[in-house]
């Protein structure tokens, strides 16, 4: 995987979660978000994911074994717009 630029982090997170189908009741551990990204980007990815939670794009579900997250289905259209803009920009580059 090529290095992610800072502006690529948010769409990359949303795209990863959407591709895996982590919407509503299907969730994954917060710790799984940076997997597959370059090691030096993992801290930035976690910070961006926390901001996505605050912004309401990602829902959180606290459990006894850690924080679980999923995409907010109510913001599906916005999420796909962000992903599509990012993919079309990457295709042009």
Where are the language model's segments positioned?
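Surface-exposed polar/charged interaction patches
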Residues: 20, 55, 86-89
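Short helix-coil junctions and helix-kink-helix linkers
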Residues: 30-43
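Short beta-strand-to-loop capping motifs
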Residues: 37, 71-73
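Short, amphipathic alpha-helical interaction segments positioned at domain boundaries
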Residues: 74-93
């Amino acid at each position: 995987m090529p290095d992610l630029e800072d502006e690529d982090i948010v769409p990359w997170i949303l795209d990863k979660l959407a591709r895996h189908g982590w919407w509503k009741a299907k969730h994954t551990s917060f710790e799984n978000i940076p997997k597959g990204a370059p090691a030096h980007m993992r801290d930035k990815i976690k910070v961006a994911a926390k901001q996505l939670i605050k912004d309401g794009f990602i829902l959180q579900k606290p459990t006894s074994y850690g924080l679980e997250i999923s995409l907010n289905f109510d913001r599906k259209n916005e999420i796909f717009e962000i992903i599509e803009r990012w993919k079309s920009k990457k295709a042009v580059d």
